[in-house]
Structures are given as structure tokens and as C-alpha cells.
Amino acid sequence: MDQFECINVADAHQKLQEKEAVLVDIRDPQSFAMGHAVQAFHLTNDTLGAFMRDNDFDTPVMVMCYHGNSSKGAAQYLLQQGYDVVYSIDGGFEAWQRQFPAEVAYGA
């Protein structure tokens, strides 16, 4: 895959449920602590190395931000780092929280 794909929250949720992909959240620490998808890994400059060690390059990665804009740059970056399949989640955490309020965790 040379380019990331955009995915809606329903499809992202299904991929998580079926363990077909991992989810990363690139929002700032305060926003992440105030609410994030239950299975999300908080991906920051400080946690990138650990994420890359723990997730093979053939593992599909879904990137979540606030509204689905910043995630596009991060998705492209992960492709450049060697990940084979990367998605940017349309609508970001705002859409996730609206559609799946029971699947939001709080705290870091």
C-alpha cells in the first residue's frame, strides 16, 4: 500500500472486534486522558519506538485523531516507516464517541 486509506468508525470498530487491526490515538495527552477508544494505544513521539517494536509491519494500523484530519499525516508517516496497511479514521475520536459511547475509556 503506497497510500493510506480512509475508514469510517463503524468499519474501524468491526476491524477491532475481529482483531484485524490495531488502533492508535495521536491526540495530546490531556485529550487522551479525558476519553479514548478502549483498545487505543496512545501514539506519541515518546511511544513510537515501543509501538514499532510491539507491532509487526504487516499489522494493519488505524490512526485516530480529533476529527480525522491530523490522522492523515500520521497514517502517511507510518506507511513511510514501513507499515503495509494504514487507515485514517474519518471523524476521529469525536465520531467514535458519538457512535460508540460505551466503548470510551478515561485516564491515561
UniProtKB/Swiss-Prot annotation:
Q: What happens when the gene is disrupted?
A: The deletion mutant displays no apparent growth phenotypes. The mutant is capable of growth on glucose, glycerol or acetate minimal media without supplementation. Deletion of the gene decreases total rhodanese activity by about 10%.
The cellular component terms of Gene Ontology attached to this UniProt record, alphabetical and capped at eight, are: cytoplasm
Catalysed reaction(s)?
thiosulfate + hydrogen cyanide = thiocyanate + sulfite + 2 H(+); thiosulfate + [thioredoxin]-dithiol = [thioredoxin]-disulfide + hydrogen sulfide + sulfite + 2 H(+)
MF terms in GO = thiosulfate-cyanide sulfurtransferase activity
Q: Which Pfam families match?
A: Rhodanese (PF00581)
For the keyword Transferase, the answer is yes
Alphabetical keyword list: Cytoplasm, Transferase
Record-linked PROSITE patterns: RHODANESE_3
Q: Where is the active site?
A: 65 (cysteine persulfide intermediate)
- Describe what upregulates or represses it: Expression is positively regulated by cyclic AMP-cAMP receptor protein (cAMP-CRP).
Q: Which SUPFAM superfamilies match?
A: Rhodanese/Cell cycle control phosphatase
Span of domain Rhodanese? 17-105
**Principal localisation:** cytoplasm
Domain of life, source organism: Bacteria
Q: What class of enzyme is it?
A: transferase
**What's an example Gene Ontology biological process for this entry?**
sulfur utilization
Per UniProt, activity regulation is: Incubation with the cysteine-specific modifying reagent DTNB resulted in a greater-than-90% loss of activity. Does not exhibit anion-specific inhibition.
Q: What exactly does this protein do?
A: Transferase that catalyzes the transfer of sulfur from thiosulfate to thiophilic acceptors such as cyanide or dithiols. May function in a CysM-independent thiosulfate assimilation pathway by catalyzing the conversion of thiosulfate to sulfite, which can then be used for L-cysteine biosynthesis. The relatively low affinity of GlpE for both thiosulfate and cyanide suggests that these compounds may not be physiological substrates. Thioredoxin 1 or related dithiol proteins could be the physiological sulfur acceptor.
Q: What family is it from?
A: Belongs to the GlpE family.
UniProt subunit comment: Homodimer. Monomeric in the crystal structure.
- Spell out the note in the miscellaneous section: Overexpression of GlpE can complement the growth-defective phenotype of the thiosulfate-grown cysM deletion mutant.
> What protein name applies here?
Thiosulfate sulfurtransferase GlpE
